[in-house]
From Swiss-Prot:
It comes from Methanobrevibacter smithii (strain ATCC 35061 / DSM 861 / OCM 144 / PS). The keyword DNA-binding applies. Coiled coil: none annotated. This is Putative HTH-type transcriptional regulatory protein Msm_0453. Residues 131-189 form the HTH cro/C1-type domain. NCBIfam families: PRK04140.1 (NF003162). Keywords: DNA-binding, Transcription, Transcription regulation.
Length: 313
């Protein structure tokens, strides 16, 4: 059995070998690793036992995935019910959880899992169009096919309209009757876009809201907040740390993950600082003073200053 540190290293090695850019490892936060390949971003969290994740951790992970247009995935070894099976998706708080072998199959071979483990057994998503097409080719009514598959007509109707999932046994029977594949692969690497982001107030960054940014405060991430325009086609975001009476030494240390994660997520990193003694940058991160933030009339002015200070380093 892998320990968690070894698992994280193997995940990092796997992704980099396939051309992904990976962040540093942040194993104390709501995510451990962020990886990017072209437009695809993965937000990954590892547990030896996937039941170790709590609701607050999962919620923050999902919120960040929505902001970054990323796919959140939990990778683990086991659950309370036993070892995670290869090719099976488990869910915890609506986040897919898989074994390392399942991740490896997706990354190396583009072999995506079909089976979902849920209360009551194993289920698959079925292709309703394929079922209907082949049923009609065989001149079977809904009831005919339902009887052959040992389900009700209403259930068969739901399969054809993709309202419900089928258990694996029923899917196998359908494939045998229709002589074709009816199950659907589940591409966990493809993000599920959701607008359900719970923006909040962040002390020291409230003036970003006046510029039209929605701000997501974080508790378990290597940055204080992430800000994104609420009503714009511009999908880029700001990764933000605020002063919070921290020493300059502490802030400089915090600049390292801020820079690292901004590069992977294509975000603009910025410190929002009250202390006038601190110059226009900390480490390699631009600094915006709180009083400056109050004076900006639109986000373009803010972004212009951030980029100018970045260029002047």
């Amino acid at each position: 059995m892998l320990n968690r540190s070894k698992m994280l290293q193997e995940i990092d090695n796997l992704l980099t070998s396939e051309g992904y850019k990976t962040s540093n490892i942040y194993d104390q936060g709501s995510f451990d690793l962020v990886a990017r390949k072209n437009l695809l971003i993965l937000l990954l969290k590892t547990f030896l036992n996937i039941d170790s994740i709590n609701e607050a951790n999962a919620h923050e992970m999902k919120q960040l995935a929505n902001i970054f247009l990323a796919s959140p995935i939990i990778i683990g070894e086991k659950s309370r019910n036993g070892i995670l099976e290869e090719g099976v998706i488990y869910e915890r708080y609506d986040i897919p959880a898989i074994s390392f072998e399942t991740l490896k199959n997706m990354i190396l071979y583009k072999e995506y899992p079909e089976i979902l483990a849920d209360r009551g057994g194993y289920f698959v998503k079925v292709d309703g169009n394929v079922i209907k097409q082949y049923r009609e080719e065989y001149s079977l009514s809904l009831k005919d096919l339902a009887d052959l598959a040992h389900v009700s007509r209403a259930t068969m109707y739901k399969y054809e309209n993709e309202i419900v999932r089928a258990n694996t046994e029923t899917a196998m029977i359908l494939e045998e009757i229709l002589n074709t594949k009816v199950t659907l692969d589940i591409d966990l690497l493809k993000p599920t876009i959701s607008e359900d982001i719970e923006y909040s107030n962040v002390e020291g960054a409230d003036d970003l809201s006046k510029l039209g940014y929605g701000i997501l405060s974080t508790n378990k991430s290597p940055f204080d907040a992430v800000a994104k325009m609420k009503s714009s086609k511009d999908k880029s975001s700001l990764l933000t740390n605020v002063e919070k009476n921290r020493s300059e030494k502490t802030l400089k240390r915090m600049a390292i993950p801020l820079k690292d994660l901004s590069m992977i997520t294509s975000s603009e990193p910025v410190f929002i600082i009250n202390n006038d003694k601190i110059k226009d940058s900390l480490g390699t991160i631009p600094v915006i003073k709180s009083w400056e933030l109050k004076e900006f009339e639109n986000p373009s002015e803010l972004l212009k200053i951030i980029r100018e200070r970045k260029d002047n380093m």
